[in-house]
Amino acid sequence: MSNPFDLLGNDVEDADVVVLPPKEIVKSNTSSKKADVPPPSADPSKARKNRPRPSGNEGAIRDKTAGRRNNRSKDVTDSATTKKSNTRRATDRHSRTGKTDTKKKVNQGWGDDKKELSAEKEAQADAAAEIAEDAAEAEDAGKPKTAQLSLQDYLNQQANNQFNKVPEAKKVELDAERIETAEKEAYVPATKVKNVKSKQLKTKEYLEFDATFVESNTRKNFGDRNNNSRNNFNNRRGGRGARKGNNTANATNSANTVQKNRNIDVSNLPSLA
């Protein structure tokens, strides 16, 4: 069997010929899907420096150095007893303004020595005078005091007492004319006399009449009442021929609209005479 590939020539490879590797052609991906490629590492130089940092509770939560575990891992360099948190100067209560009070201000605020001495001397003198007055009053109180009065002076004193005074009678003037003129005396006389009209009271008028009451007839005539009611009903409707155009009954009844009930007994009605 003949080989048809012999017509193409010698297929033996030449050892001197350099065979180039095939070039891989990569097609550009236009898909919007995320590729399975790890994200690039953050560049700290490109980070925004003016970015506001969280504060408050959010800052405490994001602080990675805070926490009990991190604090326990740190070494305590100084003891809490050796270092004082509040270090103040020995002259903390002293004024550092450099201003001092004058002697006049000191004397006005705390008192002058000379004035204090004079005030003490005056107080001692007042105390000695009060002691002398108290001693004199005690001596006078020790001596008995007797009031001597004569009998006439005692009687006059009792008579002048307000409880022993005799009430004086009221003086009454007996001149009747003088009293009458004093009552009629008027500073401004009336120019016009007003006439007062007296109104008469209205009297009530009573109407008297005798009324007699009699028991009504207990027996009722139902037959007449039924007949009258039927007649009245026929008169109002115009009878059986009213629907057919017979208005003769209505014409006769319209002339006499008031009908007298003859079944009423007049003797049973009360009399107004």
From Swiss-Prot:
Residues bearing the modification Phosphoserine: S32, S41, S45, S55, S73, S118, S229
Principal location: cytoplasm
Keywords assigned: Acetylation, Cytoplasm, DNA-binding, Isopeptide bond, Nucleus, Phosphoprotein, Translation regulation, Ubl conjugation
Biological role stated in the UniProt entry: Ribosome preservation factor that protect a small pool of nontranslating, vacant ribosomes in cells under nutrient starvation conditions. Under nutrient-limiting conditions, cells reduce ribosome biogenesis and degrade ribosomes via autophagy (ribophagy) or proteasomal degradation. To avoid excessive degradation during starvation, STM1 binds to and protects 80S ribosomes from proteasomal degradation. Under nutrient-sufficient conditions, TORC1 phosphorylates and inhibits STM1 to prevent formation of dormant 80S ribosomes.
Phosphothreonine: modified positions: T181, T218
Annotated Low complexity bias: 224-236, 244-257
Protein name, per record: Suppressor protein STM1
GO molecular function, one term: RNA binding
Note: Present with 46842 molecules/cell in log phase SD medium.
N-acetylserine: modified positions: S2
BP terms from Gene Ontology: negative regulation of apoptotic process; regulation of translational initiation in response to stress; ribosome hibernation; telomere maintenance; TOR signaling; translational elongation
Residues joined by cross-link Glycyl lysine isopeptide (Lys-Gly) (interchain with G-Cter in ubiquitin): K46, K121, K171, K184
